[in-house]
Amino acid sequence: MPNNGYLDKSVHWKVRAGQISFAEPTHGEIADAIRECGLATEVGQRLGSGKEADVYLCRSDGALRVVKVYRQYRTSHRADRGSIKLESMGQRALRELDLLTYAWQGGARVPEPGRRVENMFSMQYLGTPQEIAPMLQHAELARPAEFLALTIAGIEGLAEAGVVHSDLSPFNILVHRGEPWFIDLAEGVRVDRLGYPPWIRLQEAIHSVERGARALGRYFRRYDLEVDAPDLLRRVRAKIDLFRVG
């Protein structure tokens, strides 16, 4: 199915015919859907659960992959609870995959994107065959100062690729082969194109970097390290203020 923002028409026919239940699907039903649409040949355990989506460990012809599935009805957003979101969850999966693709093509350290089907998409697995790469929040760093420098460089790398992570925190950075890898770009900001007025897009991106710097600062203080937020903002702004409006 092409990566456009619309669900397959058969989904709507099934809704109208009463063939689709509006209860959140079980793990078995999700696994069946992942296999049937060709995103993986084997579906294992759920690796994690976020505000709107769940992540599953899968295999595709033996190779480890990850599949992210946006929940259709159950989210942590109060306004969304109980609503029917077949269209919007497909749109959100599309948006995140697009941001991941732009970042990856721009050389940022993010999982290699796969493909999307409706509210699900696949991407690169990070870790060993025995264990997934840990979140920074749960990792013990042997060289924290070096890792902090790599993280700052990674944030700049995302900006150079035209993407700013708007939910940057130790929970959205994985430690893989001693380096930071950025995940969960669902609410990221594109800064390499027109659309919104440039000043509005710039301010949104800068506020995102400020929040991320505070979150990372709280984490690295456990190692008696400080995140130089003003310097990070200055360097990121220089990369994303394409129209010199800031």
Predicted regions span which residues?
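Ferredoxin-like alpha/beta domains used as RNA- or RNAP-binding modules
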Residues: M1-A40, A139
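C-lobe/activation-segment region of protein kinase-like
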Residues: F147, A159-H165, H176-G246
